[in-house]
């Protein structure tokens, strides 16, 4: 075995198994011998762990353990026949080299380490890679599968000591939990212990049950009777405090109080609601209360001091507080009620965190004092909008059923209860309907009347006397909509125009710019969402006429709670897009990571989709140039990894013209743009992208190992992408793709060059027919350099109805081999061009070919006598060609390994760079950490497309060269030496004959001797018997020489022809279709990265 030295791979485990320069001297030589002819899967932990961690038990670094057979055995999964079968209903079971059990859930990319592992782990498959075999000691497969897992498998590991210079290096464990609040936790433990003791001692439970019954008996049906409740609680406390069972509880009274409250709450609450029946606060008639009515002092500020965005912020806080107060109806204890009340007031006053959208807003309330009156006024609105039905009952409960009466009088809870009490009084004053209250009630009625007229159910689009509603035009509903917003959403455009023209002073441009709903929607966003384009155009006209460019940019790029600007809602509003397009921030992303351009591209239901897409792209391009930059395609990738190419329905040439464009980019599901087009049958996009030279047609989806052909369900789609496959094939003549199974019969789609009306034809052919065709061709060309026997055998194994990743890789490899094989056969004109028109054509050609072959005379009938000079000439010819082929084969072997390692080391470089960046960011020294940000790399020395194509062609050419070399080797080192051996024996026999019978001209034949013998048992002489025996031997030797010579002659003629074909194929394959294509593609692709 030759010793070779290839670069070391970054991952120590992968390097140890596949990249051993001297396997016979390696400590893993027994493992290599065991795996020599076997197929297996390697589980590879991340290089980060193997290089920077050590085993807790052995104290050895993990990269040293990678050269320990016992450690490695657990990472090698042996493959059996069942490894190919994939059923979605059950998982795939594998056995490791040391007998442990591993279960792989291919669908979820999860591995379970089970029987035999002392640590059972659930591992995540991070990536699946196909590693072309580049060593000489594994013969079981041409490609091996590596499953990269998220952590080591069969050991406990910790970071090495040198990582102490990094902070927070260790990853947070999956099951880690935040530290609990100790005080709350201890109280909960005491409560649990208290309840456990009660359940263990039924006598105590019986005593407490009697007290519960006494409350239900003594307390009137319409009176909650706080005194009775407190009395039975005190009675239970007096009876339990001296009991040794409860002496260790520090909060015994609170525990007893809470336990009684838990068991008697329904009784107390029913008595409360009965008690206040008919006297509760009815908030239904106050549903039209608005901020402008309750914060009159704020609205009466001078024009220079009033800012509408303060009101919009108040509306958002009101909304949050109202939603939270609704939870009060679900409470069943004093603690729950008090918690809801306090949190509601905190949300209202802005003292707690709000959602991310609101945190970005300026605190407009800093311009006003949040005094008690203001808070009460806002809380009135909260109560109205939360639609609380038992407000007095909740207040009474909070005031009377606390386990600590001082808590409701002092502190934040005392303030909250006082505020609630003031609100109840506020509503009681409203019910009296006197003074200012009567005026407020009148405004509510007037508001209701106006809103009815503005309702979308009202067909009238006019208000007869708008002036009568002047005092309520500042109304805002619970969604934060102003009167203008309500007009817009209900398409009351005449009223909208009247308000804007007649009451311009009440609605200045500054307020129009700040008018937003609670979800952040501006008037312009509302108009687009409502489809009210007329209102949108009015607003845009006002803005363009009255606002500066800075104000326009700020307004148009305001975002709602979904981080969407008005541009994100523009789907088919061409005129509006043109009017405001230059002010749009085209890089601004919404919460889903989608830019405005992405949203427009993704809006498929618009009637003028292509025109809208083209217009939006041109405007965005202009915007980029205006900001002194080029259009950046990467700015428009969403949170799921979808690019503009992924979502564009038609007209992709506008994107394909971009230079720095990765048209093979995968989203987070592993789908390329082409896969998406094929999946959704976007034929125009398929047609355009398959003409782009940058396309990698057979890009594989990592999680499923699907290619675009696996998503094609339509013949027209298969034909279109098959045409690109033909053009990318070795000689551009034929392409095999899309293996399908029908009742365990495998069929394949074949696209080939056609002489008919269309330049290409796609047909479905049974794989058994292809197998028969290969057998027929092999009979006609027994010395072909194409490894047809290998392909025939591989087709025989295609009997599985469903395939795992392992099977899919084999199928993909076979289809590539058949594509290359039939490209060569067509190139050398061994089969007719129109053979693949349909399956019947193939079967007919096979029958005709068989008939012609049977009619040819057999070479054995007229064996050719070969002279030594002729054998010498053949031997010299074959030896020269064998030396040339061997030299070329060695060069191909080196080239194949170099190409594989270029790809492997490029990946290693990228992984190492990512690891270095990751570690650099964790350096404790901030200056050192920041230095890592400036590291620039350029690991893409060659394009992925050009490397893959060249490697596939080199591997195929190497297979063909090995096949031809084996034929030459058989003739040169077996057949010809055998002829010379028999020739020597023949000469020796002749010499012996001449020496023994010098007077004989030539040896007698057996027939001649027998004819001269007389009838009856005449005894031949010893001399005659010897002469006859030598004559028979000479004849047999002569016959053998003729047969061997004839066989060598025929083989030489066919090999000479095959060598000629091989040289023609080699030159075209290596020079034109491989090296030149590699250089051309690589230069053109990499030029775009400069």
UniProtKB/Swiss-Prot annotation:
UniProt-listed GO biological process terms: early endosome to late endosome transport
InterPro entries attached to this UniProt entry: Ankyrin_rpt-contain_sf (IPR036770), UPF0507/Ank_repeat_27 (IPR051248), VPS9 (IPR003123), VPS9_dom_sf (IPR037191)
Gene3D superfamilies the UniProt entry points to: Ankyrin repeat-containing domain, VPS9 domain
Domain VPS9, chain residue ranges per copy: 289-436
Single GO molecular function: SNARE binding
UniProt source species: Saccharomyces cerevisiae (strain Lalvin EC1118 / Prise de mousse) (Baker's yeast)
Protein name: UPF0507 protein EC1118_1M3_1541g
Gene Ontology terms: cellular component: early endosome; late endosome; plasma membrane; transport vesicle; tubular endosome
